[in-house]
């Protein structure tokens, strides 16, 4: 999910063509260099893609409540073949864009022996490895340079897993509260357009729950909010621009999934996520107009409970509506092992 300011790209066409290639990216985020309105104000920062958009789905409100460790491995392949403007139309300066990214993320969670409000206190850490590969058609006026393979930004924070509600001998509801910080330790090259690291700190509170209306049917969701702090790390901006700081607008999103147990230990269902950015991005303290991102993805998925300690999730996400972002298909695999 690459954020993009098409207005900046189009305005950059009025200068030399090389300036179009100096578009700045946060983690998997397209920041097109150029001007907005009459202020000659380039977009310097966008919403990081180092967030959980569709990474979690079925049975999300559950995790272990007894002290111990769990390791979760995520594999996500994204094949993006369109770059959309603020109206959801293709940005015309990009001919046959193709941005492939492979994400291998390792999450380590530890449930402590401590209790709070009746729930189990735990700690999360997540570290991604990301490979980027971008290509464009021969007639593309603008193109983007990827930063190859490298480490992404680190996510860490505490969570509170509440004990499941039991009715008639079975769980009917479970919930979790969590707050994460994203630390900008990822690979970042100011001369590249696609980077693994976003270059700034973020704070992400979230709430996950699962409801079982019937023994076989579950509904899960995770509600998220992200606040992004200012960045003083200069991205790939036009030459001569005096950069002081940039800040991505805050955003909210929801991961939603529902599944049915078709045979014992195997569930099939649908999964989706919707994200909207509440405020425009800012450069040097000034708002850059029409830079808010909005995306809606949905698709099929399933989960296999292999045994008491191992589960495998699979999700396909297809674009339904995308604005100010790159668009394409995403495939997720998630493996959970509890020690």
Regions found by a protein language model. Give the residues of each.
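Short loop/turn motifs that connect adjacent beta-strands in outer-membrane beta-barrel proteins
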Residues: 59-68, 80, 113-121, 164-174, ...
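Surface-exposed strand-loop-strand hairpins of Gram-negative outer-membrane beta-barrel proteins
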Residues: 40-50, 77-103, 143-146, 190-195
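Transmembrane beta-barrel strands of outer-membrane/channel proteins
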Residues: 45-49, 71-79, 123-129, 177-183, ...
């Amino acid at each position: 999910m690459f954020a993009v300011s098409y207005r900046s790209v189009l305005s950059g066409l009025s200068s030399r063509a090389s300036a179009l290639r100096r578009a700045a990216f946060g983690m998997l985020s397209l920041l097109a260099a150029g001007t907005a309105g009459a202020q000659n104000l380039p977009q310097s920062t966008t919403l990081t893609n180092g967030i959980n958009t569709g990474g979690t789905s079925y049975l999300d409100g559950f995790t272990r409540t007894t002290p111990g460790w769990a390791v979760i491995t995520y594999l996500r392949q994204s094949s993006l073949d369109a770059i959309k403007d603020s109206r959801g139309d293709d940005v015309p300066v990009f001919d046959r864009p193709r941005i492939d990214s492979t994400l291998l993320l390792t999450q380590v969670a530890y449930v402590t022996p401590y209790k709070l409000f009746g729930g189990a206190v735990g700690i999360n850490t997540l570290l991604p490895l990301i490979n980027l590969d971008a290509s464009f058609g021969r007639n593309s006026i603008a193109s983007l340079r990827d930063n190859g393979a490298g480490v992404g930004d680190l996510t860490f924070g505490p969570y509170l897993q509440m004990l499941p509600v039991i009715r008639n001998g079975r769980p009917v509801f479970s919930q979790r509260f969590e707050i994460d910080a994203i630390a900008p330790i990822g690979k970042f090259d100011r001369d590249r357009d696609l980077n693994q690291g976003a270059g700034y700190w973020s704070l992400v509170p979230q709430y996950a729950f699962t409801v079982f209306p019937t023994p076989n049917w579950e509904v899960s969701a995770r509600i998220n909010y992200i606040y992004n702090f200012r960045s003083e790390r200069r991205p790939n901006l036009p030459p001569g621009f005096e950069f002081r700081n940039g800040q991505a607008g805050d955003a909210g999103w929801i991961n939603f999934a529902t599944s049915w147990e078709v045979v014992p230990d195997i569930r099939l269902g649908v999964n989706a996520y919707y994200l909207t950015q509440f405020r425009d991005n800012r450069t040097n303290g000034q708002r850059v107009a029409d830079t808010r991102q909005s995306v809606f993805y949905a698709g099929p998925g399933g989960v296999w409970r292999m045994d008491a300690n191992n589960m495998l999730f699979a999700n396909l996400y297809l674009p339904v509506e995308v604005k100010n972002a790159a668009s394409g298909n995403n495939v997720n695999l998630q493996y959970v092992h509890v020690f």
